[in-house]
Each structure stands twice: as C-alpha cells, then as structure tokens.
Amino acid sequence: MAVLEILTAPDPRLRVQSKEVTDVAAVQTLIDDLLETLYETDNGVGLAAPQVGREEAIVVIDLSENRDEPLVLVNPKVVSGSNKEMGQEGCLSVPDYYADVERYTSVVVEALDRNGKELRIETSEFLAIVMQHEIDHLSGNLFIDYLSPLKQQMAMKKVKKHNKLRAR
C-alpha cells in the first residue's frame, strides 16, 4: 500500500471523466492505496480516484470515528435523489475552502463493492452528501463548480495560498 499525492485544483487531471472498471480484481491495490491516502489526511471522509490522478471510477468513504469502516464504491451512480438542501462542503482537492452547496439529502446509489458484488444503497443526510460529492469527482466536477464565479475565484485564491505554504 502507498500514500498517494492528492491533486489540488486547478490540476487538469481533476477534470478527467473516469473510466468504468471492468475488472475489479485488477484495482485492489488502487483501492488499498486510496484508503491509506484517505486515512493519512486530517479530516477527509472520502476520496475519489481522480483526486490522485487515476481514471478508474472508484470512490472510498469512511465516516466512522475510528476510521475503520470503509465503504468502497466501484462504478457508482446516483440513480435517484430527493429533498435538496444547502449544506457546507469542503474538499481535499480544494484545501482550506468551505462553501454551501445544494445537494439531495436522500439518494439511491448503485455500485459494485471491492469484491465486484452489486450494491444498491439508499441513504440520507451526511452519507448521501458525501456520496454525491465523491461521485461528482468521477465526472470531473468539483464542489466549487456549483458556486458563483466570485466564490470560485475566492476558492482558487485559498488553494494557491495553501499550495504556496505547503511548498515551503
């Protein structure tokens, strides 16, 4: 397993459309690396393969307090959603910036688990929001895309400042 570099906006690799995984067995190391990378962050709850420069349609999520209950979603799709509300989001690829985004509070997601078994997850509240956020990455979308141009500029200023501080 390896901790991978998390890309930050405006890296063009974050905008790449993910490719469907056809052989789940072939991506087990990537799944492990995504989980290890997620667990190395201070406050991350989800990570998508494009955030580490990979094109596979894979998302990992762990909302548990002890970070020991990973949810692995391969080729996930939101098939339905209801009850939109505004809620604050952040992103490991847009560090140090948080903003209100409108999302469904209840969703149905279909995916494969890490063993290739079909999943259909009906969930609400925070997990529903995180799933939508991470699945957006698979289409090359960031949460700041839902914001006004002014707020997008503010977000990018924060990211540039974060990257300068990190480079020191």
Swiss-Prot record:
Location of the active site: E134
Function: Removes the formyl group from the N-terminal Met of newly synthesized proteins. Requires at least a dipeptide for an efficient rate of reaction. N-terminal L-methionine is a prerequisite for activity but the enzyme has broad specificity at other positions.
PANTHER family in the record: PEPTIDE DEFORMYLASE
Cross-referenced InterPro entries: Peptide_deformylase, Peptide_deformylase_sf
Classification lineage: Bacteria, Pseudomonadati, Pseudomonadota, Gammaproteobacteria, Vibrionales
Free-text remark on how the cofactor is bound: Binds 1 Fe(2+) ion.
A Pfam family: Pep_deformylase
Class of this enzyme: hydrolase
Enzyme Commission number, as recorded: 3.5.1.88
Similarity remark: Belongs to the polypeptide deformylase family.
Gene field: def1
Catalytic reactions of this protein: N-terminal N-formyl-L-methionyl-[peptide] + H2O = N-terminal L-methionyl-[peptide] + formate
GO molecular function: metal ion binding; peptide deformylase activity
Protein's name in the database: Peptide deformylase 1
Secretion signal, residue range per the UniProt entry: none
Requisite cofactors: Fe(2+)
Keywords: Hydrolase, Iron, Metal-binding, Protein biosynthesis
Binding-site positions, Fe cation: C91, H133, H137
The species this protein was found in: Vibrio vulnificus (strain YJ016)
